[in-house]
Swiss-Prot record:
Belongs to the MEMO1 family. Pfam families: Memo. It comes from the Bacteria. The lineage of its organism: Bacteria, Thermotogati, Thermotogota, Thermotogae, Thermotogales. This is MEMO1 family protein TM_0087. InterPro entries: MEMO1_fam.
């Protein structure tokens, strides 16, 4: 089954040439973006890496997202890319994995890695084959044009989380460890924005707690801060999955808010790019 884009023309341009140019500008942005384009991919990814990557409209979060993809290129071309995104629509299964076929963007199609999907499904107590959770969801889709831009051809495992509980994060981390055994060069993207629709000062404070938990690679602290500080982070389950894995290092690459882009600091959304390896 081919998944058609749900948010082309909304979150990013629907025309190929315009999309390529906007992604280029995300990388070349010197104020919030990294200010340079990624170099050529010179090697194969040898060990798993994780990215925390935002998923708003490219005009707002694209320059922050560019930091993560720029860094990922330095590690090498992945054998498969797992993209874990939160379910914003309420449709589908609690943990829905798109099982087969391909996903289309204005830059072309990317195949679903059916062998990798099989490994995840057979080693998870929660993950289920599901199309419905993905049909209208944007959080996974918006990562794919960036992947196509920096790597060209990749295969993916799309996982959409309505259930973002600690139990699911631990379960998925365990299933992904099995995947790593067969696909050592896996890139795992946790698609998330941070605090939503509060003023700049409040969002910077709340986001700092999330960054602290990520830097400490502490999933329990992440969940504690979410509740204690009332943080409206949308994709915490994917981030907690990364924090439950056996990564040894983490680097915070960039944090900004929508207010840094628009100048409106009354109601902002926080964006973070980080890499785990």
């Amino acid at each position: 089954m081919k998944r058609k884009p749900a948010v082309a023309g909304l979150f990013y341009p629907s025309r190929r040439d315009e999309l390529i140019e906007q992604i280029r500008m995300c990388f070349l942005d010197k104020r919030i973006g990294p200010g340079k384009l990624p170099g050529p991919v010179e090697t194969k990814l040898q060990n798993p890496i994780g990215l925390v990557s935002p998923h708003a409209g490219y005009i707002y979060s694209g320059p922050v997202a560019a930091w993560g993809f720029l860094e990922a290129v330095k590690f090498g071309e992945p054998s498969v890319v797992v993209i874990i995104g939160p379910n914003h629509t309420g449709l589908g299964r609690p943990v829905g994995v798109w099982p087969e076929g391909e996903w289309e963007t204005p830059l072309g199609t990317v195949p679903v890695n059916e062998r990798a999907v099989e490994i995840v499904l057979s080693n998870s107590r929660y993950a289920e084959e599901d199309f419905m959770s993905h049909i209208r969801e944007h959080s996974i889709e918006v990562q794919i044009p960036f992947l196509q831009f920096v790597f060209g051809e990749v295969s993916i495992v799309p996982i959409c989380l309505m259930d973002q509980s600690p139990a699911v994060a631990e379960d998925l981390a365990s299933a992904l460890a099995k995947l790593v055994a067969e696909f050592p060069g896996v890139l795992i993207i946790a698609s998330t924005d941070l605090n939503h629709y509060e003023d700049q000062r409040t969002t910077l404070r709340k986001d700092s707690y999330i960054i602290e938990a990520i830097e400490g690679m502490d999933p329990s602290l992440l969940y504690e801060y979410l509740v204690r500080e009332d943080i409206s982070m949308c994709g915490y389950g994917g981030v907690a999955t990364l924090l439950n894995m056996d990564f040894e290092n983490v680097r915070i690459l960039k944090h900004a808010t929508s207010g840094d882009v628009s100048g409106d600091t009354l109601e902002v959304v926080g964006y973070l790019s980080a890499i785990l390896f």
